[in-house]
Amino acid sequence: MELQAGARLLLLLGVMCYGHAQIQVHVEPRYASIVDVTNGGTWGDWAWPEMCPDGYFASGFSVKVEPPQGIPGDDTALNGIRLHCTRGNSQKNTHVVESQSGSWGSWSEPLWCPGTSFLVAFCLRVEPFTFPGDNTGVNNVRFRCSDGVELEGPGLNWGDYGEWSNSCPKGVCGLQTKIQKPRGLRDDTALNDIRIFCCAS
């Protein structure tokens, strides 16, 4: 009887250990590091990250922009960023990823790195806090490609660009956005910051 109980215990421990190993393999991150910048806006919360499928990396991007609203409108400027992930060097074989975006504006056409190059770094144009005034958060974004070419989104011009992020040597595989939710009659800023995920391979 004791031998049977011992065998059952060993079997249970084996299953638990195997299951634990399977879980560890399942959640193993597909990215090498997370890269950010220092001048992001202060409002909002970090949304969920979105990743390119396995074997894909970002070689283009598009932005969601609300045009200037005039007086007494409420400007939000950049509301979202999408990564356009490719497999190999074909723009026809693409997958679009988007973390949470703001409610206003429309999406631009994608901007692509030349040839077989891919996105490796970014910087943000952010309007600093103004009081009294209409705050906007992120106004525009630039991405640097692996061949050194810099791409700038068709955003707005309030604020200044900060320093470039660190570079992702093997490319960008995902992003995460910091978004302020709609505030009704109060001042909205929408997109305030982003992070990018560097590919592991």
Curated annotation (Swiss-Prot):
InterPro entries xrefs: VOMI, VOMI_sf
GO annotations of cellular component type: extracellular region
Principal location: secreted
Organism: Mus musculus (Mouse)
Signal peptide limits: 1-21
Protein name listed in UniProt: Vitelline membrane outer layer protein 1 homolog
Disulfide bonds, paired cysteine numbers: 52-85, 113-145, 168-198, 173-199
Family: Belongs to the VMO1 family.
Subcellular location: Secreted
Key words, A-Z: Disulfide bond, Secreted, Signal
TM helices/strands, residue ranges: none
Superkingdom of source: Eukaryota
Taxonomic path: Eukaryota, Metazoa, Chordata, Craniata, Vertebrata
